[in-house]
Amino acid sequence: VPIQKVQDDTKTLIKTIVTRINDISHTQSVSSKQKVTGLDFIPGLHPILTLSKMDQTLAVYQQILTSMPSRNMIQISNDLENLRDLLHVLAFSKSCHLPWASGLETLDSLGGVLEASGYSTEVVALSRLQGSLQDMLWQLDLSPGC
């Protein structure tokens, strides 16, 4: 498979995930920069400059989304899994050894946070994920390093 096709597929999948997030209407109601107490484990917006950092960030979001009860989260989590696979192919094409990121070890307490504020967690996670994906889309045009 030509690497340009993999890169194009990666960008298309990112756009698809962003569209899915947009289709979940309540995600529009929060700023991705908004600080919500107790949700510090959700990655914020900061430049994601390398393929390994992209994979780590997606692993955390995937872990958070699979902990949520919403059916929408299952589809987005599956999309993130596919996106991570594509990032690994891109990394391999650049001779990068990209270890499979595992997310956060500290999410044991996530169950309690979700019980207390599941809706807020979902809104903030999706909003920040959307921002991170748009950042990744931009970074992919700059040919990120390992």
From Swiss-Prot:
Molecular function via GO: hormone activity; peptide hormone receptor binding
Main localization of the protein described in the UniProt heading: secreted
Disulfide-bond pairs as recorded: C96-C146
Pfam families: Leptin
Keyword Kinase among UniProt keywords: no
UniProt key word Manganese: no
Keywords assigned: Disulfide bond, Obesity, Secreted
GO CC terms of this entry: extracellular space
UniProt-annotated location(s): Secreted
GO terms classed as biological process: activation of protein kinase C activity; adult feeding behavior; bone growth; cellular response to leptin stimulus; energy reserve metabolic process; intestinal absorption; leptin-mediated signaling pathway; lipid metabolic process
Similarity annotation: Belongs to the leptin family.
Described function: Key player in the regulation of energy balance and body weight control. Once released into the circulation, has central and peripheral effects by binding LEPR, found in many tissues, which results in the activation of several major signaling pathways. In the hypothalamus, acts as an appetite-regulating factor that induces a decrease in food intake and an increase in energy consumption by inducing anorexinogenic factors and suppressing orexigenic neuropeptides, also regulates bone mass and secretion of hypothalamo-pituitary-adrenal hormones.
Protein name: Leptin
Originating species: Pan troglodytes
Organismal lineage: Eukaryota, Metazoa, Chordata, Craniata, Vertebrata
Gene designation per UniProt: LEP
